[in-house]
Amino acid sequence: VTRTAREVVELYNLVVWNQRNFELADELMGDNVIRHEVGEATTLTHEQAVARIVDHWEMFNTIRFDLNLVVAGDDGEHVAIVYQSPMELKDGTRTDVGSMEIFRVVDGRITEVWNCGYKQGVWE
């Protein structure tokens, strides 16, 4: 059974990231993942997309993604999130960042992510 785009994005944030489930990351990431930013796009192979998650986790003692808002598009492929992310770095520094991302999910796998960056602080 193929998961809905919303289910994939929620699993990616709440299970892959929040529970360090890298096996699920392997299942949810596409053959290639295009990460869009303003002015540039980076295409990651499947292996690079999974390694990016593992490598990011190595910088933190804890990191959590709280999804303040999840909006699934009518096309069945796009999902937008507003998130808050409390984290603790390896040196014990604690901080919060917030941002928005839009995901494209095809056949149950994340194939594209749009992110214009994050900002330190908490959503008001």
Residue locations for each model-derived region?
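C-terminal and inter-domain tail/linker signature
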Residues: 1-124
